[in-house]
């Protein structure tokens, strides 16, 4: 594992994903319909995409375009994607550019690529469409083109974003349905809003319906070991054992920033306390986990007593999902808690609002889960204490 740049690299995971995208087996050809990768916030998704997956895809000869829809909130999703595509095409046109050098084996000459359209016209009302641009790019470069759109759910909810998704779907179809195509167009959308990400691949009204959905693999114990090793050379540092640090990392939702924060607090506390690190560290982690979850848990209170009752029913059910939120038994339980009659439309309205707030998710028809397993665990732990 390379630690020279202070980044924990997940080479194996990246190489496996890259191979599945670019060299799918006959049973996994559906990746060419699009892939949607979901994972909770602050678990290292973006770092993995930019520092591991992109290089792994490029190592297999792909041309990769990465766009983060949270990079500039003042710009629309369509503007950000078009800007990234234009920039990539411009680099391919520019003699001596680093990107062009990667494809020097194509014998393009000193002038680089020459496209049959003006870059400024890309995406304009009467100009070149993304489908036309990507089709020409694949035909001339004869490579797989991978477009990664981070926080892709930002494209939902606006006419501009919806038009963008339909344009990308058209690009996928234009390239991948071409007989004997020398390369494919692969679309990878990632995001932290699990329910919306799932909807983008399963709802009939969505352009990428039928695409593959998968969960981001959170960091494991090897990351914890790497983090401990990285700071172990600091003079006078106090560290917990790997097992204790791993347990704390899990408690804090597999969030790298929280692990480092806990280790920093351990140093501060050890200066004024004789408590062994393996005893102090779990307390620090539990406190940080509780504080981090408070933001989400306070948001639940904003949905009133009925909203809290609905959330409780979901949280107390199976981690894989709860159904029957609108059934007679559930409605009776809500009524008992709120002291008034509850009708299915009220429950549906609140459930939809909590989905929009990313508090709960809908992984399947009529099935609901807590969006963040970390928040669910903190909620359950607190309610167990209240029942004692």
Describe each PLM feature range.
Residues 1-41, 47-56:
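Walker A/P-loop-proximal flanking segment of P-loop NTPase domains
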Residues 33-146, 152-156, 161, 185, ...:
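P-loop NTPase nucleotide-binding core
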Residues 154-203, 216:
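Sensor-1/coupling segment of RecA-like P-loop NTPase cores
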Residues 216-244, 251:
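Conserved small helical "lid"/interfacial subdomain of P-loop NTPases
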Residues 248-250, 254-342:
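Winged-helix-like regulatory helical subdomains adjacent to P-loop NTPase cores
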Residues 337-357:
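Short amphipathic alpha-helical interaction segments
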Residues 363-377:
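Accessory beta->alpha helical hairpin/"wing" motif in late/C-terminal subdomains of nucleic-acid enzymes
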Residues 374-388:
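Short, amphipathic alpha-helical interaction segments positioned at domain boundaries
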């Amino acid at each position: 594992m390379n630690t020279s740049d202070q980044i924990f690299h997940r080479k194996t995971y990246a190489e496996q994903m890259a191979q599945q995208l670019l060299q799918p087996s006959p049973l996994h050809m559906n990746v060419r319909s699009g892939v949607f990768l979901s994972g909770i916030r602050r678990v290292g998704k973006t770092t993995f995409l930019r520092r591991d997956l992109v290089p792994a895809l490029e190592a297999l000869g792909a041309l990769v375009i990465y766009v983060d829809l949270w990079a500039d909130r003042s710009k629309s999703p369509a503007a950000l994607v078009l800007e990234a595509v234009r920039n990539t095409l411009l680099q391919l046109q520019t003699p001596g550019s680093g990107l062009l050098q990667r494809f020097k084996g194509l014998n393009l000459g000193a002038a680089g690529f020459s496209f049959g359209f003006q870059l400024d016209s890309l995406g304009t009302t009467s100009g070149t469409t993304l489908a036309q641009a990507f089709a020409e790019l694949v035909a001339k470069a004869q490579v797989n083109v991978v477009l990664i759109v981070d926080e892709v759910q930002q494209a939902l909810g606006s006419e501009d974003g919806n038009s963008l998704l339909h344009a990308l779907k058209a690009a996928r179809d234009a390239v991948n349905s071409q007989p004997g195509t020398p390369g494919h167009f692969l679309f990878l959308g990632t995001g932290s809003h699990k329910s919306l990400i799932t909807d983008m691949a399963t709802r009939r009204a969505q352009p990428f319906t039928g695409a593959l959905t998968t969960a981001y693999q959170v960091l494991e114990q090897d990351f914890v070991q790497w983090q401990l090793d990285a700071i172990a050379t600091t003079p006078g540092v106090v560290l917990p054992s790997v097992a204790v640090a791993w347990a704390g990392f899990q408690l804090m939702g597999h969030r790298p920033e929280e692990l480092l924060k806990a280790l920093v607090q351990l140093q501060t506390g050890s200066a004024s306390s004789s408590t062994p690190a393996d005893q102090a560290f779990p307390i620090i982690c539990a406190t940080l986990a509780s504080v981090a979850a408070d933001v989400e848990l306070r948001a639940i209170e904003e949905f009133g007593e009925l909203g809290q009752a609905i959330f409780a029913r979901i949280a107390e059910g199976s981690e894989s999902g709860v159904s029957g939120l609108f059934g007679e038994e559930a409605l009776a339980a809500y009524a008992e808690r709120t002291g008034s009659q509850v009708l299915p439309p009220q429950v549906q309205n609140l459930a939809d609002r909590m989905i929009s707030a990313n508090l709960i998710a809908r992984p399947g028809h009529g099935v609901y889960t807590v969006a963040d397993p970390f928040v669910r665990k903190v909620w359950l732990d607190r309610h167990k204490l209240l029942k004692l």
